[in-house]
Curated annotation (Swiss-Prot):
Its cofactor is Zn(2+). NAD(+) binds at residues 49, 202-207, 226, 231, 272, 316, 366. One of its GO terms (cellular component) is cytosol. Homodimer. Binds 2 Zn(2+) ions per subunit. This is Alcohol dehydrogenase 2. It holds the Pfam family ADH_zinc_N. Zn(2+) 2 binds at residues 99, 102, 105, 113.
């Protein structure tokens, strides 16, 4: 392309400070260096993680910054040493990476790349410690190595998944974060078999993606657990057969589920990050063979392990970004995985702050933001 090797001036939504509306600015995006790729972002979606770091909740503030990490685009140019991608390739940027050389990448069981594992505080490129974005010569920091709230962005090649060019980027862009996280927690970690019972705790986008995985696996009974009764109707689109609101019961929700399933579910996936929900998810699985997935710290009686329950943690659904995500896209292309039902809003890039407002009000699942007006 004519822009290869040159600085590109483009629009980007810049977060200048915590909690303030993003500002549409003209930024300069430098060409990719060794083992880097410059992508033209066509579609990006807003994830709760973007909002969390925009608000700087409990984190080290890194501003000014270009947020965004769930997106789809086309390779504009590549840096020295990049051999797997060429300009024109359709790609998904990913907030974590796969160098294909470290012990984790060589393992069939792990996706925690030593080189490119998620780093929320790093606002620069990993190779030279510099930002590729500037305004009037001053650096604008990156976010999760992706910064997809920009028309063009430079990303390490290990954080870019090449996908089927026939796949619609306005749909599969969702797979670069939340949907794959939930889907893989079910398909790759808890691995329910056809006819099993599955409980999903937390029915946001990640939880519903986990539920979609249970549906795809042929689970005979899928129990959705959430404190918001309005989530029930929406969950039915994802295969939910039963809905339990812990506030409707006087006993712990795990006891309710054990009673309604004659001893417990076969699999449980916890998608809230709440310690109490983790305990409930673990203790509602059947003794002897139950498997529960969790996201963080929790406490339970050691006897629950002696009773042959299994607890598993996972990151990004256990998918390796470069070698695993193309297969998830293929699931969508084969009509096994349904993505349209996750998309509740669509907006032009100029209205990106409206997407933040929608999420802050708890409206919808995913808002897809298109770069073209």
């Amino acid at each position: 392309m004519a822009t290869a090797g040159k600085v590109i001036k483009c629009k980007a939504a810049v977060a200048w400070e915590a909690g303030k509306p993003l500002s549409m600015e003209e930024v300069e995006d430098a060409p990719p260096q060794a083992m880097e790729v410059r992508d033209k972002i066509l579609y990006t979606a807003l994830c709760h993680t973007d909002v969390y770091f925009w608000e700087a909740n409990g984190q080290t503030p890194v501003f000014p910054r270009i947020l965004g990490h769930e997106a789809g685009g086309i390779v504009e140019s590549v840096g020295e040493g990049v051999t797997e991608l060429v300009p024109g390739d359709h790609v998904l940027p990913v907030f974590t990476g796969e160098c294909k050389e470290c012990a984790h990448c060589m393992s069939e069981e792990s996706n925690l790349c030593d080189l490119l594992r998620i780093n929320v505080d790093r606002g620069v490129m990993i190779d030279d410690g510099q930002s590729r974005f500037t305004i009037d010569g001053k650096p604008i920091f990156h976010f999760l190595g992706t910064s997809t709230f920009s028309e063009y962005t430079v990303i390490h090649v290990g954080c870019v998944a090449k996908i089927d060019p026939e796949a619609p980027l306005d749909k599969v862009c969702l797979l670069s974060c939340g949907i794959s996280t939930g889907l893989g927690a079910t398909l790759n970690v808890t691995k329910p078999k056809k006819g099993m019972t599955v409980a999903i705790f937390g029915l946001g986008a990640v939880g519903l993606a986990a539920m979609e995985g249970a549906r795809m696996s042929g689970a005979s009974r899928i129990i959705g657990v959430d404190l918001n009764p309005a989530k029930h109707e929406q969950a039915k689109k994802f295969g939910c057969t039963d809905f339990v609101n812990p506030k409707d019961h006087t006993k712990p929700v795990q006891e309710v589920i054990v009673e309604m399933t004659d001893g417990g579910v076969n699999r449980a996936v916890e998608c809230t990050g709440n310690a109490d929900a983790m305990i409930s998810a673990f203790e509602c699985v059947h003794d002897g063979w139950g498997v529960a997935h969790k996201e963080a710290v929790f406490k339970t009686h050691p006897m629950n392990f002696l009773n042959e329950r299994t607890l598993r943690g996972t990151f990004f659904g256990n998918y390796k970004p470069r070698t695993g995500l193309p297969g998830v896209v293929d699931m969508y292309m084969r009509k096994e995985l349904e993505l349209d039902k996750f998309i509740t809003h669509s907006l032009p890039f100029s209205q990106i702050n409206t997407a933040f407002d929608l999420m802050l009000r708890g409206e919808g699942l995913r808002c897809v933001i298109r770069s073209e007006e």
